[in-house]
Amino acid sequence: MMKCVIETASAQVFAQMSAYIAERNSRDALFPEAVREGLSHAHVEAEENGLRAPSAVVGTLLATLAAGGASGHSQGAVCVTPAAGVVGLHILRGLPEKATLTCIEPEAALQNSAKQAFKLGGYSPSRARFLTARPLDVMGRLAADSYQLIYADVSPLELTAFAERAWPLLTAGGTLVFADSLLDGTLADATRRDRDTEAARAADDYVDTLAADHGAVVTRLPLDGGLTLVTKR
């Protein structure tokens, strides 16, 4: 009984903090009005298309990672998600002015929606490039050791293959972010043996091998559906 009370209280506190952060972001002088307009458009588009989009908390984390991972060797960041309008605006807010965001998504309509969001956000077309293709088909075309941030919202069945292709693309200090990789905590349920859960567990084990074999720093965060961050040192 006491455990349930504590868990409920913790959930309420987290919800309050998340609401406060979202409210602060909505009136932050450092958060340009144009970006807020672009985000509003992108969120509406994501909702209408039934897409998952990161919370305000995760969005500010992405902006911080984009800013903190900047280096002279970086070409920018990579965004692999149907909700590229939301994710991309947060990342662009943190990227250096001359850095480029590469968006990969097979559906042209979703790419066009992201382009409109970036335009409303005040970013020139030169700040983003769009590859209309399956991510695993084109990751090999990207330059190695060139990206400070790679964000991936992909099927659990593709997590390991994506990590294998994304890891060489990161610069030193760069981070790979897997959205919803912990499947809302179902990885901890030993009775779950469906394909998605097993694939997500395999990917979770794989990122630990990156830590063991390559010195990666792996961080798991209970945000949204569960984030996994893999940083190259």
Regions found by a protein language model. Name each.
Residues 1-149, 156-171, 175, 181-233:
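A short alpha-helical cap/connector motif
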